[in-house]
Amino acid sequence: MGLDIEMYGKEDRYLDFKEIEESLHDALFHTNNNWRSYLYLRKIRDYYLTNVEFDRDEIDKFIMDLENIKIFIPGDYDPALSELIKILSSHEIQKISIVGD
């Protein structure tokens, strides 16, 4: 069970969908406690309670949290995390909605 990210452009035009897979979520939140230091990561910790929207400024802060937590998770998750960061870094994306199951 992963988290779903829906991405939107200008005027709330739907762009794409990306999943934060369960294994990456576990690496971010269950293999260490450092996520508590990152405001935007704390917002997506709970599968069942997560239902957040980030505007472009918040997306950039979320990306910074992802970049900063990289050193605390196993290296085999680096490709998935780097891909997520690359996708979210597109400034065509103006808003994201992250929802759990």
Model region roles, listed by residue range:
Residues 1-101:
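Acidic (Asp/Glu-rich) sequence patches and key acidic residues
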